A protein has these predicted regions:
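Extracytoplasmic/periplasmic beta-strand context in beta-sandwich domains
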Residues: 36-38, 66-68, 102-104, 184
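C-terminal secondary-structure termini that scaffold catalytic or DNA-interacting sites
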Residues: 30, 35, 46-67, 72-74, ...
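C-terminal catalytic core of tyrosine-transesterase DNA break-rejoin enzymes
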Residues: 11, 15, 21-22, 118-129, ...
Length: 232
């Protein structure tokens, strides 16, 4: 799906474990490329009427709001998505159309909101078209949870990344949810710990295709600063 409209949704679900409603409800104003982090603080309402062009109010997340690091491995995807948004806006306006600037990171080409049910159905069609074994979009979230836990063993931090309660992450991973088993060092999960877990997972996903250092270097830094200033 690299280079298609599905690239970023799959990255957010498969690399970060975001829910579909959180993905299509993520606003560009909650992404800070200069600080290399983004906030999952709202989600798309469950039932968006067909033909909706503007969203004035989002729904709260299912759990506590969370701030997640943008790893070096994930940054190129974020930059490409911002470039895609800019191109779509320019093409829409050049063609005489109206661009609905909802400041959504994942939206239709004219900026209007995606609907959760249509996204799920379209993902199913994509999987069939690619002749891949059947999976639901939500299965990408479970895959992220399982892989992060297997690679790091950090039960509590994985739960914080996913926006799960201890009971929820335990059920998802199929392990004990005895609160007494959670040591005091995990009670306050800081951004640095989330960074460590996510970086371990993301490096394992693409050990030979990481765009860092000399390959991306100063160009990535310049783009990040430029995008950050555009969002302010």
């Amino acid at each position: 799906v690299i280079g298609t409209e599905w690239e970023m949704p799959v990255v957010l679900a498969g690399m970060y474990g975001l829910r579909m409603s959180e993905i299509i409800g993520l606003r560009t104003t909650n992404i800070d490329l200069e600080k290399m982090q983004f906030g999952v603080v709202e989600q798309m309402p469950f039932k968006v009427p067909p033909g909706t062009k503007t969203i004035t109010e989002m729904a709260p997340t299912k759990s506590n709001d969370r701030i997640l690091p943008i790893t070096e491995e994930a940054l190129p995807y974020f930059l490409r998505q911002f470039d895609l948004i800019a191109r779509q806006k320019a093409l829409t306006e050049a063609g005489g159309g109206v661009y609905y600037d909802n400041k959504l990171f994942i939206a239709k080409p004219d900026g209007s909101p995606q609907r959760r049910d249509r996204m799920s159905a379209n993902f199913g069609q994509l999987i069939r078209h690619l002749e891949m074994p059947h999976i639901r979009f939500h299965d990408l979230r479970h895959t992220a949870a399982t892989n992060m836990h297997q690679l790091t063993g950090d039960f509590y931090t994985v739960g914080e990344i996913l926006g799960h309660t201890l009971k929820g992450i335990g059920i998802s991973l199929g392990i004990s949810t005895n609160l007494e088993a959670v040591t005091a060092q995990y009670v306050d999960v800081r951004l640095e710990r989330k960074q460590s877990v996510l970086q371990t997972y993301h490096k394992a996903l693409q050990p030979k295709t990481t765009v860092t250092g000399k390959e991306a270097g100063q160009e990535t830094s310049k783009k990040a600063k430029k995008k950050s200033s555009e969002m302010e």
